[in-house]
């Protein structure tokens, strides 16, 4: 019988201890997998979210795009759009708004007004930063699209009319009432879980604000001809008062600031979980070996080599960790899904952003750490059996 088969029989003879080890590794392995998914989850998810719309450069007035409003944004967007390496530029201006309902208080929403600037007539069509789910996109000053939450709570559908009161200057100003037609239900990628968003053209926003919208904007999205880094440098040259950043640069800045906390938490908890797994398996194997010292000495006397009994102990560790590791995969993915829903409920977190993102490299690191755990946890028990004095142990067994 080979070492693995012999180790399996040893574990079957002690089902309670084996089950404790397997369940412990499964729990630790699930948490370990989640920490590995969390370590790069936000970075991968944010990169995908930024790239999804096709805009590879973001232009703003602050350190991070969208934090400070851009003065003379329409003029700046036109200047940017005339660069040879720019395909199109999209100006986004947000305003606080309320949508009246037939029953209940008004819905507080964020209204995004957008307009396209381009030097090419072929690229002049509006490319909104949202995805139409039902109906069509808003094209006229009296048309808007709303998210599914607004449609559900206000009982709206494509073709419905709403009374919207927008505030483009300050939240304390009197909100004028404007009748607009809902032409589509849209998905807004950066909308938070507990927020509502509506969208339309820049002219629709100006109409909703009674013309009091000004020339400021929150963000300018730019699509390059292919060279995002070179285009960002060209934008910084023609608009020195603005900050242009590629999607990768935006993610890099977030990784150094907002996302660094989760990476640190992931590293600490990964170290703790691996250490706990090593201690758990080492204790279980040591107790098992100490209870079977007489049996192991007898096997050595019958001809089992030192290498063979060491392999038996290592095989026991591998079976416990391997079985627990396999169980930890579905358990870890289920736990990650639940934790992701909880964390996405925090204020200001886009609903499309995920904290836990599966990557093949995370699975490879997970497997490597479990293999290392099985080996390290078995070192002390293997040392015990390798140095076991056969004659003295058998004599103690007979006397005892």
Tell where the protein language model's regions lie, with residue ranges.
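Hydrophobic, regular-secondary-structure patches
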Residues: 29-110, 128, 134-137, 233-238, ...
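Transmembrane alpha-helical interface segments in multi-pass membrane proteins
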Residues: 273, 286-288, 294-340, 365, ...
């Amino acid at each position: 019988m080979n070492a693995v088969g012999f180790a399996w029989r040893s574990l079957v003879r002690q089902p309670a201890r084996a089950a404790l080890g397997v369940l412990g590794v499964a729990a630790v392995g699930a948490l370990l997998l989640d920490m590995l998914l969390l370590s790069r989850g936000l970075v991968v998810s944010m990169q995908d979210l930024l790239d999804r719309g096709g805009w590879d450069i973001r232009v703003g007035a602050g350190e991070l795009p969208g934090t400070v409003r851009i003065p003379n944004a329409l003029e700046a967007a036109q200047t940017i759009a005339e660069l040879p390496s720019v395909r199109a530029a999209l100006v986004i201006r947000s305003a606080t708004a309320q949508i009246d309902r037939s029953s209940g208080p008004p819905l507080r929403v964020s209204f995004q007004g957008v307009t396209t600037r381009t030097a090419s007539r072929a690229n002049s069509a509006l490319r909104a930063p949202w995805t139409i789910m039902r109906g069509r996109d808003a094209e006229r000053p009296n048309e808007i699209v709303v998210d599914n939450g607004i449609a559900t709570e206000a009982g709206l559908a494509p073709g419905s009319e709403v009374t919207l009161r927008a505030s483009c200057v300050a939240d304390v100003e009197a909100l004028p009432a404007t009748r607009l037609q809902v032409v589509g239900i849209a998905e807004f990628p950066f909308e938070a879980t507990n927020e509502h968003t509506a969208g339309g053209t820049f002219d629709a926003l100006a109409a909703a604000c009674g013309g009091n919208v000004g020339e400021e904007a929150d963000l300018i999205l730019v699509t390059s001809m292919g060279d995002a880094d070179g285009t960002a440098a060209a934008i910084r040259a023609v608009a020195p008062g603005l900050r242009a950043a590629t999607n990768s640069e935006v993610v890099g800045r977030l990784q150094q600031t907002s996302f660094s906390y989760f990476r640190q938490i992931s590293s600490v908890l990964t170290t703790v979980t691996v250490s706990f797994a090593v201690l758990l398996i080492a204790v279980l194997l040591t107790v098992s070996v100490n209870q079977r010292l007489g049996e192991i000495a007898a096997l050595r006397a019958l001809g089992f080599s030192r290498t063979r009994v060491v392999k038996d102990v290592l095989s026991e560790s591998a079976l416990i960790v391997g079985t627990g590791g396999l169980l930890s995969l579905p358990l870890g993915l289920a736990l990650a899904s639940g934790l992701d829903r909880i964390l996405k409920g925090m204020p200001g977190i886009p609903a499309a952003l995920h904290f836990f993102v599966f990557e093949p490299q995370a699975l490879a690191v997970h497997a490597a750490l479990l293999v290392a755990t099985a080996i390290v946890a078995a070192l002390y028990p293997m040392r015990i059996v390798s140095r076991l004095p056969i004659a003295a142990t058998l004599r103690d067994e007979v006397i005892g």
